[in-house]
């Protein structure tokens, strides 16, 4: 009888911990898509040893809009 009560109490405690630990958690961040940024200014034209023009390119990150923190199950504020 005592074991049954303790195991039920432990299950309730574990359930409450799982619910409250994920209450205000943000969603996992999505991976940022990288693309090449090439500058188009005329002074940035580099020449290789063969004489071909190249543009200095680097990897750029797309700026994602800032998302507000959403609490799951919360009612909208009016």
UniProtKB/Swiss-Prot annotation:
Signals that turn on the gene: Up-regulated by Imiquimod in the skin.
Tissue expression as described in the entry: Highly abundant in the testis, colon, eye, and tongue. Detected in the epithelial layer of the colon, but not the small intestine.
Signal sequence range: 1-24
Organism: Mus musculus
Function of the molecule: Highly cationic protein that has multiple functions. Acts as a chemotactic factor that mediates lymphocytes recruitment to epithelia through binding and activation of the G-protein coupled receptor GPR15. May be a tumor suppressor; together with SUSD2 has a growth inhibitory effect on colon cancer cells which includes G1 cell cycle arrest. May regulate keratinocyte proliferation. In addition, through activation of Mas-related G protein-coupled receptors (MRGPRs) contributes to pruritogenesis by activating itch-selective sensory neurons and mast cells degranulation.
InterPro entries recorded: GPR15L (IPR031713)
GO molecular function, one term: G protein-coupled receptor binding
Localization of this protein: Secreted
Protein known as: Protein GPR15LG
Record carries keyword Signal: yes
Keyword Transit peptide included in the entry's annotation: no
UniProt-listed GO biological process terms: defense response to fungus; defense response to Gram-positive bacterium; G protein-coupled receptor signaling pathway; lymphocyte chemotaxis; mast cell degranulation; negative regulation of cell cycle G1/S phase transition; negative regulation of cell division; regulation of keratinocyte proliferation
Superkingdom of source: Eukaryota
UniProt keyword annotations, A-Z: Antibiotic, Antimicrobial, Chemotaxis, Cytokine, Disulfide bond, Secreted, Signal
């Amino acid at each position: 009888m005592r074991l049954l009560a303790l195991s039920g109490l432990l299950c309730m405690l574990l359930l409450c911990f799982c619910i409250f630990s994920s209450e205000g958690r943000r969603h996992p961040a999505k991976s940022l898509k990288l693309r090449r940024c090439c500058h188009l200014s005329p002074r940035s034209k580099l020449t290789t040893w063969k004489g071909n023009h190249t543009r200095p390119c680097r990897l750029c990150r797309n700026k994602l809009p800032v998302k507000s923190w959403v609490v799951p199950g919360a009612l909208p504020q009016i």
